[in-house]
A protein has these predicted regions:
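Active-site loop segments of alpha/beta catalytic cores
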Residues: 1-161
Length: 161
């Protein structure tokens, strides 16, 4: 089950944790209760810097978060929750990897860095992408490098970890 809601911008939540707990969490908790009673996995889709709400999500059974965006303290979150919360993403699609002049080696090294940082111990699903028109050759090339490196490095990584 996916609960899709946004409570934050890239800089901060746009609703206080107190207001979230009073106004939104009861509805999310009801959805979580239904999903847990049916033994379903709960994925929270929530963009932006929304790390302030993770404890609340855990209260109603969320076990996956996408997209876990780099504006959050993802290393701290990974350390705190380990594999109890699957971080889906952890990729900066708007940073240097997304720039048209990003080199193949840089893009590939970022895939490896992301996997090396978040994959150990489980609780991680790589989700890398490049923003832009799929007709743009630069976007196509960077997306292909990401996919290829994820496949090659990911297979090798999980064989040894």
């Amino acid at each position: 089950v996916s609960i899709t809601d946004d409570t934050a911008t890239a800089k901060n939540p746009f609703i206080s944790p107190k207001m979230y707990r009073e106004l939104v969490k009861p509805y999310h908790a009801r959805l979580g209760e239904i999903a847990m009673n049916a033994n379903l996995i709960i994925d929270m889709h929530n963009c932006g810097r929304c790390e302030d709400f993770i404890e609340d999500w855990m209260d109603f059974g969320v076990s996956m978060w996408n997209p876990a965006q780099v504006v959050n303290d993802l290393v701290g979150i990974k350390k705190k929750y380990g594999n109890k919360l699957v971080l889906v993403g952890c990729w900066d699609s708007q940073g240097p990897v997304g720039w048209p002049d990003a080199t193949e080696e840089f893009v590939r090294s970022e895939v490896r860095r992301c996997m090396d940082t978040f994959a150990p111990g489980g609780g991680f699903a790589f989700w890398g992408s490049v923003l832009g028109s799929q007709d743009d050759p630069s976007v196509k090339a960077r997306a292909a490098w990401i996919d290829d490196e994820c496949t090659k490095y990911g297979h090798a990584f999980y064989k040894t970890h």
